[in-house]
């Protein structure tokens, strides 16, 4: 499988899909964001449970409930985006800065994000997403939600 990088046509198409997906999150438009998913999407999100997929997939109502937990738009800034793509499969990783007022407090969180995409009927769709934060390895089992990129 040949991996294509450096603003290839496929990478440009993928970036367009991702930008529209992220804008759906920022503007709290569940239909727009979810239109970029495969029908069998599997997600490892920050929120429980351990896995979303199959009969336990995140639905439109769950997405809207999360969106509506924010007052106003959601800050969803993507940093250090890296994409690798073949003609039909791609993956990307980045850091995400999530911010806003999530009732009743401010949210200011950096987390890691990795996703896999598949080209289906000529369109790039998100097939898998994985969000994570590191944990302090001091025995506290506390998530390191205070970290910021250097």
Regions found by a protein language model. Give the residues of each.
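A short, structured loop/turn motif at beta-sheet edges
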Residues: 83-90, 105, 117-125
């Amino acid at each position: 499988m040949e991996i294509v990088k450096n603003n290839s046509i496929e990478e440009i198409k993928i970036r367009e899909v991702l930008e529209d997906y992220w804008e759906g999150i920022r503007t709290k438009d569940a239909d727009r964001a979810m239109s970029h998913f495969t029908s069998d999407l599997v997600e490892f999100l920050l929120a429980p449970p351990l896995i979303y997929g199959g009969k336990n997939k995140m639905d439109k109502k769950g997405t809207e409930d999360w969106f509506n937990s924010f007052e106003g738009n959601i800050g969803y800034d993507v940093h250090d985006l890296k994409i690798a793509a073949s003609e039909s499969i791609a993956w990307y990783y980045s850091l995400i800065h999530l911010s806003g007022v999530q009732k009743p407090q401010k949210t200011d969180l950096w987390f890691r994000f990795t996703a896999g995409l598949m080209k289906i009927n000529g369109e790039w769709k998100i097939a898998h997403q994985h969000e994570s934060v590191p944990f302090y390895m001091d025995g506290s089992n506390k998530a390191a939600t205070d970290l910021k990129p250097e």
